[in-house]
Amino acid sequence: MSNLKLWDSVCVTDPAMTKKANVGGNKITSIKPQYQIKMATEAFGPYGTTWGFSDIEYNYSLEHYGLVVFKATFFFPEGEFVISNSIKIWKDNAKTKLDDDFAKKCETDALTKALSKLGFNADIFMGYFDDMRYVEQAASMTAQKSAPKQAVDNSKLI
């Protein structure tokens, strides 16, 4: 088995599942978390049983700096590794508005970082999304890949 088999199967990102953002003055391409979870579920199986986080810890020792540190073990069928992340817990610099979604945001960001180590959405992290020609090719490639799938009949949902 090729060491890059998983990487090669998950490295191309559907541009429709991304959006441009400005974070701290940096222009980035963010990936929709549910898209990442779907990709990982396709590769590994259901979240929480065959892949996900275990031993989750939130460390508040840097709280006086406005930071909380997330640490967990990311597991998947081929192994596991420790991942950590930090996030600001305040919505403002005056430290008057607590971000009550900080834990969810921190875990989601850690999931993105963990999956990126395995090659998920590697084209974004390798800077390919800065090239519009690449983005157009990725859109074409992902459209062809998903075309054979059956479309959802929305009339049955009403």
Annotate each predicted stretch with a short phrase.
Residues 2-3, 134-158:
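Interfaces that engage single-stranded nucleic acids at replication/repair/recombination sites
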Residues 1-37:
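N-terminal, Lys/Arg- and Ser/Thr-rich interaction peptides
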Residues 31-32, 36-141:
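Positively charged, aromatic-enriched nucleic acid-contacting surfaces
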